[in-house]
UniProtKB/Swiss-Prot annotation:
<feature type="binding site">
    <location>
        <position position="337"/>
    </location>
    <ligand>
        <name>Mg(2+)</name>
    </ligand>
</feature>
<feature type="domain" description="B5">
    <location>
        <begin position="278"/>
        <end position="353"/>
    </location>
</feature>
<dbReference type="InterPro" id="IPR045864">
    <property type="entry name" value="aa-tRNA-synth_II/BPL/LPL"/>
</dbReference>
<dbReference type="Pfam" id="PF03483">
    <property type="entry name" value="B3_4"/>
</dbReference>
<protein>
    <recommendedName>
        <fullName>Phenylalanine--tRNA ligase beta subunit</fullName>
        <ecNumber>6.1.1.20</ecNumber>
    </recommendedName>
</protein>
<keyword id="KW-0547">Nucleotide-binding</keyword>
<dbReference type="GO" id="GO:0005524">
    <property type="term" value="F:ATP binding"/>
</dbReference>
<keyword id="KW-0648">Protein biosynthesis</keyword>
<keyword id="KW-0436">Ligase</keyword>
<comment type="similarity">
    <text>Belongs to the phenylalanyl-tRNA synthetase beta subunit family. Type 2 subfamily.</text>
</comment>
<dbReference type="InterPro" id="IPR005147">
    <property type="entry name" value="tRNA_synthase_B5-dom"/>
</dbReference>
<dbReference type="GO" id="GO:0000287">
    <property type="term" value="F:magnesium ion binding"/>
</dbReference>
<dbReference type="Pfam" id="PF03484">
    <property type="entry name" value="B5"/>
</dbReference>
<dbReference type="InterPro" id="IPR045060">
    <property type="entry name" value="Phe-tRNA-ligase_IIc_bsu"/>
</dbReference>
<dbReference type="InterPro" id="IPR022918">
    <property type="entry name" value="Phe_tRNA_ligase_beta2_arc"/>
</dbReference>
<dbReference type="Pfam" id="PF17759">
    <property type="entry name" value="tRNA_synthFbeta"/>
</dbReference>
<keyword id="KW-0067">ATP-binding</keyword>
Amino acid sequence: MPKFDVSKADLERLVGKSFTVEEWEDLFLYAKCELDDVWEENGQIYFKADSKDTNRPDLWSAEGIARQIRWALGMAKGLPRYEVEKSDVVVYVDEKLKDIRPYGVYAIVEGLSLDDEALKQMINLQEKVALTFGRRRREVAIGIFDFDKVKPPIYYRAAEKTEKFVPLGFEEKMSLEEILEKHEKGKEYGHLIKDKPYYPLLVDSEGNVLSMPPIINSELTGRVTTETRNVFVDVTGWDLNKIMLALNVVVTALAERGGKIKSVKVVYGDFEIETPNLTPKEFEVEFEYIRRLAGIDLSDEEIKELLERMFYEVELENGKAKLKYPAFRDDIMHARDVLEDVLIAYGYNEIKPEEPKLAVQGRGDKFVEFEDTVRELMVGYGLQEVMTFNLTNREAQYTKMNLDFGEHPFEEYGHHPPARLVEIENPISPKWSALRAWLIPSLMEFLSQNTHEEYPQRIFEVGKTTLINENKETKTVSESKLAVAIAHPRVTFTEVKEILDSVMHHLGLEYELKEIEHNSFIPGRVGKIIVNGQEVGIIGEIHPKVLENWGIEMPVAAFEVFLRPLYREPYL
């Protein structure tokens, strides 16, 4: 979870009211933060804020916390309003960046008055959003520039690796290749673009370089100081919705410092957009649902008032509420998310505890304990555990695994339904558009993101997959699986099979392998795993085409098994 430092004096200046340290400890809860530490430095009191929500980047700075507290205390209510004036600035996006880093969104913020603390918060927010929300700049990278040194129009273009500019913190020009090899940020983030035919570059009309996304800004325009009054903000990445949200978070935070937001026209090959877009988002909820789940007797008017303290504009109609909420939030996906905001505004500490009406004695779930036993075995074999996302997409589960959609990744034990993914009807991003049916693609993605790390790489995951089962009420079934992948120059089928042998031995199970054909694996080096006459998994050496699809240059051997048919209570 993100942690960041804030000055008590700066927070109180933004809120417009002073509080004791003890009062601040309670106030931080409104911003889904905990006060992790307090210290004094040069006569000033500082707080270490520990955010407890990775879905609210708008709360990862002093500006966001102060804004939330003003609303929570009733000093303001309803939808925060930010005026966006249209500028005549245009950014042209090069179509060659389509497979490199395709999207950029931009804004101008004028009239800033930045002291040292405001500058620290701006840099902190930029870094935290890119690190956590942007997954270490892979999905979101942010640049902020002195706009007075920029000559529009601006071009986000594909550049030859031999082009040169002076990177931030240096005095001499370096080629783009040299920056990746010698600059601290190039070494840290260079793997994101190193293998691409071109590198992204943001330049103005005079050819002056603003930045090399997602690596480093230029010394000319990328050094923002307390003397800077007008800034140009750029956000690049792979998902237009995600980078738009990041832009909204940054510009509204700067607006809390008195900045005036101006939009920028962004021209792509086949469409154009105006950014930022601060149009409020909409959601509908029934207040009876809120009352029932909250367990608190609240009137419609009381719920409306609580929501207005959490940035909502509320329109009541026949027990339903039409809600509008700010464009710097993207965490409202279900009525439960609205309920959470109601309870935060109400105050969790104000909810009276009730004794359970049933006398029960708790204990750990036996199958979960079995999963932990399997994890301990894997760690004992020298494997490193990874935890990847349940959400994925059809390309990762099928195309990159050299499978046509509809082929079995491998069959579910006990019966053989059509190999269909559980897909999301309205995904927030194409990357997260389905629930995974098998784990090996997740491990392949992990390996593809760590090709710059030392080999051998020996990883495993015990995780959930979701399969379609028409006999279930929900038409789906969640299955726990174990997957192992080993990558190094001399890895073989035998090496990964030895781990499978040992797992089965420790669980007191006998198994057999039956050779099969499977496009994800090398022919003749793949088999299905059978226990008690049931197919429970697959094992083999990954096909070179799959390795190429994932950008992995090392051989990989892997296996995956369902855990439920391996579960035997005596082994806990």
